[in-house]
């Protein structure tokens, strides 16, 4: 790891395993997320690479990948996360004291590549966790999966209600019972990784859940 070529190892391994390569391709809806731009995109990727680099070079526990009480930010990323008193474009390690973030699942990179352009996706996020963290990828979805439905009143369902409808379908239930709980646990993060208390439909977010045995 002292060899400079190890930087390519970190970049490529993290890019493949964590799907960081997809950060360059995501295009959040400009009307919904007007603050998203190239500087933030680059900062997302760099934060995750630096955490991975830190765990390897400093021989830290691999548990830090999921529960680190620190991260790496520059001014642009710190502003996005609401971390005060960070100035300049260079990245530095900061402690996350009493923070809602911690580890990869609080990184804007992961939260953005597992979202749609205009909203979050508990299914994509849950699938990412099953595949990349737990090593238990779900089978492919059945064909002609229906879109998220609305309530009889015509108003959008909350994300949790929509997921419950999917689980009510026996064809969908076996996979969604595994994917939905970890995905819904990240619903307080919007489609570009900002913390929020209400969803796109203005409903109060319930991010509770229990993983099945």
Per-region residue spans from a language model:
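A cross-family structural signal marking well-folded subdomains
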Residues: 1-128, 139
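Sequence context surrounding c-type heme c attachment/ligation sites in exported
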Residues: 78, 93-213
């Amino acid at each position: 790891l002292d060899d400079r070529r190890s930087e390519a190892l970190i970049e490529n391994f993290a890019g493949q395993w964590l799907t960081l390569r997809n950060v360059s391709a995501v295009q959040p809806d400009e009307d919904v997320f007007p603050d998203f731009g190239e500087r933030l995109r680059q900062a997302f990727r760099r934060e995750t690479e630096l955490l991975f680099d830190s765990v390897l070079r400093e021989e830290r526990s691999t548990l830090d990948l999921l529960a680190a009480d620190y991260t790496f930010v520059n001014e642009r990323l710190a502003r996005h996360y609401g971390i005060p008193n960070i100035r300049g474009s260079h990245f530095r390690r900061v402690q996350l004291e009493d923070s809602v973030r911690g580890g990869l699942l609080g990184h804007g990179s992961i939260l953005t590549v597992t979202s749609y352009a205009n909203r979050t996706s508990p299914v994509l996020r849950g699938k990412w966790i099953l595949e990349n963290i737990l090593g238990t990828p779900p089978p492919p979805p059945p064909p002609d999966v229906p879109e998220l439905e609305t309530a009889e009143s015509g108003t959008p369902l909350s994300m949790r209600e929509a997921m419950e409808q999917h689980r009510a379908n026996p064809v969908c239930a076996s996979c969604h019972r595994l994917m939905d709980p970890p995905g819904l646990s990240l619903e307080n993060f919007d489609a570009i990784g900002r913390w929020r208390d209400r969803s796109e439909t203005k409903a109060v977010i319930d991010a509770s859940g229990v993983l099945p045995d």
